[in-house]
Amino acid sequence: MDPLGPAKPQWSWRCCLTTLLFQLLMAVCFFSYLRVSQDDPTVYPNGSRFPDSTGTPAHSIPLILLWTWPFNKPIALPRCSEMVPGTADCNITADRKVYPQADAVIVHHREVMYNPSAQLPRSPRRQGQRWIWFSMESPSHCWQLKAMDGYFNLTMSYRSDSDIFTPYGWLEPWSGQPAHPPLNLSAKTELVAWAVSNWGPNSARVRYYQSLQAHLKVDVYGRSHKPLPQGTMMETLSRYKFYLAFENSLHPDYITEKLWRNALEAWAVPVVLGPSRSNYERFLPPDAFIHVDDFQSPKDLARYLQELDKDHARYLSYFRWRETLRPRSFSWALAFCKACWKLQEESRYQTRGIAAWFT
């Protein structure tokens, strides 16, 4: 029996060593897998770079990260329920430290389009986190759209078919009697104005202007033209009967502040060059603007504007819509609140192909 005595401790020592080595091997495999999964973006069966999810917010009040400030210009962020009473709130921040916990990330295209692989948020991405692609620029000024495919769940732009529609302006009914007094025609001492920052000599709008000004005097403000200090813009433009709301590129729904602010807030009749008349009429009454397509040539348009200048009744007919409607303008803060409300209205979690859609 003595030879059997030491055998038992020897077996136990070997068993413990084997178990320890096995556990160590499993730990090494696990951490190796974890590191690879963090360094390499995964493409899931749904064809995207993130897993299927219901998109349910991780917080009772959704946390939204602004990946960049639009055009790198910070703005004040009032509570959404203060902007529009009775609406829901979100915690909206530009602090990237909250990225791992954020329920949604808003990415403004302009700041990431130069080098998307380096400028977009990095992995790992929290499951259920929704990314919102945001742009107020036209496709002509949005580069590398293809690089955005497969990342985003929602779109936000001036396009009416966006998931989150953020137009440059809109009309809404007066809640009571119109607050504005009737138009003071005697204050309209000038005829036609145009404020332009990016001249673009070969652009459609500059070519049209050059033909128009051969038949009609147009006062041009902006870079390389008459100075127009920002604080005096509305005061200056309000002296004009007409304003050339010429867009820098022609795309569906691309109707910008050139109409909503420069023309309508100055109580000037907008003369528009942009998408089709029918597209404008989705957002404005047909007698609220003059479209260049209504005339065979710039010369014919010039003649019409000169006729309206002499016919007060016909000119004033372009303001009848103001008896029941008033113009409102876009703000960045309101756009972010629209994203907040959309996230709480539905939990849809899909991938959007940006390049094929935004044309």
Curated annotation (Swiss-Prot):
Changing K73T: Loss of site-specific fucosylation leading to generation of approximately equal amounts of VIM2 and sialyl-lewis x. Reverse the site-specific fucosylation pattern leading to generation of VIM2 predominantly instead of sialyl-lewis x. Changing E247K: Found in individuals with plasma alpha(1,3)-fucosyltransferase deficiency and no clinically relevant phenotype; complete enzyme inactivation. Changing R303G: Found in individuals with plasma alpha(1,3)-fucosyltransferase deficiency and no clinically relevant phenotype; complete enzyme inactivation. The keyword NADP does not apply. It catalyses: a beta-D-galactosyl-(1->4)-N-acetyl-beta-D-glucosaminyl derivative + GDP-beta-L-fucose = a beta-D-galactosyl-(1->4)-[alpha-L-fucosyl-(1->3)]-N-acetyl-beta-D-glucosaminyl derivative + GDP + H(+); an N-acetyl-alpha-neuraminyl-(2->3)-beta-D-galactosyl-(1->4)-N-acetyl-beta-D-glucosaminyl derivative + GDP-beta-L-fucose = an alpha-Neu5Ac-(2->3)-beta-D-Gal-(1->4)-[alpha-L-Fuc-(1->3)]-beta-D-GlcNAc derivative + GDP + H(+); an alpha-Neu5Ac-(2->3)-beta-D-Gal-(1->4)-beta-D-GlcNAc-(1->3)-beta-D-Gal-(1->4)-[alpha-L-Fuc-(1->3)]-beta-D-GlcNAc derivative + GDP-beta-L-fucose = an alpha-Neu5Ac-(2->3)-beta-D-Gal-(1->4)-[alpha-L-Fuc-(1->3)]-beta-D-GlcNAc-(1->3)-beta-D-Gal-(1->4)-[alpha-L-Fuc-(1->3)]-beta-D-GlcNAc derivative + GDP + H(+); a neolactoside nLc6Cer + GDP-beta-L-fucose = beta-D-Gal-(1->4)-[alpha-L-Fuc-(1->3)]-beta-D-GlcNAc-(1->3)-beta-D-Gal-(1->4)-beta-D-GlcNAc-(1->3)-beta-D-Gal-(1->4)-beta-D-Glc-(1<->1')-Cer + GDP + H(+). Pfam families: Glyco_tran_10_N, Glyco_transf_10. It comes from the Eukaryota. Residues 35-359 are lumenal. Keywords: Glycoprotein, Glycosyltransferase, Golgi apparatus, Lipid metabolism, Membrane, Secreted, Signal-anchor, Transferase, Transmembrane, Transmembrane helix. Its main location: Golgi. Belongs to the glycosyltransferase 10 family. This is 4-galactosyl-N-acetylglucosaminide 3-alpha-L-fucosyltransferase FUT6. It comes from Homo sapiens (Human). The gene is FUT6.
